[in-house]
Amino acid sequence: MDYSYDEDLDELCPVCGDKVSGYHYGLLTCESCKGFFKRTVQNNKHYTCTESQSCKIDKTQRKRCPFCRFQKCLTVGMRLEAVRADRMRGGRNKFGPMYKRDRALKQQKKAQIRANGFKLETGPPMGVAPPPPPPPDYMLPPGLHAPEPKGLAAGPPTGPLGDFGAPTLPMAVPSAHGPLAGYLYPAFPGRAIKSEYPEPYASPPQPGPPYGYPEPFSGGPGVPELIVQLLQLEPDEDQVRARIVGCLQEPAKGRPDQPAPFSLLCRMADQTFISIVDWARRCMVFKELEVADQMTLLQNCWSELLVFDHIYRQIQHGKEGSILLVTGQEVELTTVAAQAGSLLHGLVLRAQELVLQLHALQLDRQEFVCLKFLILFSLDVKFLNNHSLVKDAQEKANAALLDYTLCHYPHCGDKFQQLLLCLVEVRALSMQAKEYLYHKHLGNEMPRNNLLIEMLQAKQT
């Protein structure tokens, strides 16, 4: 069933930017994307992308790549379960309460606009990239800086990186009995990681000290309870950094040599992912799921969570001429350009563009934790045993984010939609990053026993 909407809000389709015609399969979309989504689901069509699975989808180009168009339909929230399998006209009338809530919030937004006496300014069409930001002013001197993080028991390497990310201290891959095993095995007992070390797992690994968590966030006016809970789950950044640095500094068995720069970056990403797994295990709803569903969700979104973690770190870093590593070290973009390959350099620059875009949107910590939760509970995941629980979590997070943005940013009427559009770019970036990692893997350039490659292979099987 299609639901009407308020035309004076002049909504734009979140998939292609065309004018919406009503509520279709979970949200407001245009007639074209409504029909495309319905045909794809009912006919069980499978598309392929001839490019890099990150094609631009707008009103003029929406028919060029059905694969990317369908992926964007799922990303912005169109619901597979809302399409009738019997091919009869009309959708499943199970989203009526959500539509009514959405209409009520839009009425509230209109009232705020009228009360404040300003005209609703619509942003760029959804699915159409905003104007490119001005070129960053890379005025910092070349090289790398390692600012001393506060409160670290074992700070990051203080010497310069001689070769794009390689510290002067002997950093090595953590022991097979270190946090890698300790954080994954308790949650996923069936997971087997092939070790490059001769010593087998004779006994369950002992986890290291847990990540520290900050004082509970008490919230404030206009902060939904879900966001308050998510803020309380956020780990202390200094504690996470200290743990990762400590793991990287553990001596490797039989490997006293200094690791290569790219290998070191992969190990940083491994340890960052372990901290993300620890966060997910503490999340409401996620900890209620069966282990199989937990693994399915993480296999679907691990790269997006890593990319979004990097993006938010750069927003906090606030320097256009350098990037901040999870260890607290700064790497000049000029160093990346000079020493990284063209593929990695392109990825970094594309990520920096998203950093500028989210900075312009004034992304705050409350929105960050809610978006991270939305990434974890993606609705396009198949073969879940408890799909209804995941769907409920997604709907509550969407509602919380919408409430928060309307309350705290009433002058930015479309901020909620713009934030969701940024998640589309996060996904595109993560897919490009996975392709890069797999390319390095095929060239035997990835370090052995790498968790990221195992996640890639688990997704493909």
UniProtKB/Swiss-Prot annotation:
Binds DNA as a monomer. Part of a complex consisting of SFPQ, NONO and NR5A1. Interacts with NR0B2, NCOA2 and PPARGC1A. Interacts with DGKQ and CDK7. Binds to and activated by HIPK3. Belongs to the nuclear hormone receptor family. NR5 subfamily. One of its GO terms (biological process) is male gonad development. It comes from Sus scrofa (Pig). Coiled coil: none annotated. This is Steroidogenic factor 1. Residues 119-150 are annotated as: Disordered. A 1,2-diacyl-sn-glycero-3-phosphocholine binds at residues 341, 436, 440. Residues 10-85 bind DNA. Residues 127-139 have a biased composition (Pro residues). The modification Phosphoserine is found at residue 203. It comes from the Eukaryota. The lineage of its organism: Eukaryota, Metazoa, Chordata, Craniata, Vertebrata. The gene is NR5A1. One of its GO terms (molecular function) is enzyme binding. A zinc finger (NR C4-type) spans 13-33, 49-73. GO terms for cellular component: cytosol; nucleoplasm; nucleus; RNA polymerase II transcription regulator complex. Keywords: Acetylation, Activator, DNA-binding, Isopeptide bond, Lipid-binding, Metal-binding, Nucleus, Phosphoprotein, Receptor, Transcription, Transcription regulation, Ubl conjugation, Zinc, Zinc-finger. Gene3D superfamilies: Erythroid Transcription Factor GATA-1, subunit A, Retinoid X Receptor. PANTHER family: NUCLEAR RECEPTOR SUBFAMILY 5 GROUP A, STEROIDOGENIC FACTOR 1. Acetylation stimulates the transcriptional activity. There is a cross-link at residues 119, 194 (Glycyl lysine isopeptide (Lys-Gly) (interchain with G-Cter in SUMO)). Pfam families: Hormone_recep, zf-C4. Residues 222-459 form the NR LBD domain. The modification N6-acetyllysine is found at residues 34, 38, 72. Transcriptional activator. Seems to be essential for sexual differentiation and formation of the primary steroidogenic tissues. Binds to the Ad4 site found in the promoter region of steroidogenic P450 genes such as CYP11A, CYP11B and CYP21B. Also regulates the AMH/Muellerian inhibiting substance gene as well as the AHCH and STAR genes. 5'-YCAAGGYC-3' and 5'-RRAGGTCA-3' are the consensus sequences for the recognition by NR5A1. The SFPQ-NONO-NR5A1 complex binds to the CYP17 promoter and regulates basal and cAMP-dependent transcriptional activity. Residues 230-461 are annotated as: Important for dimerization.
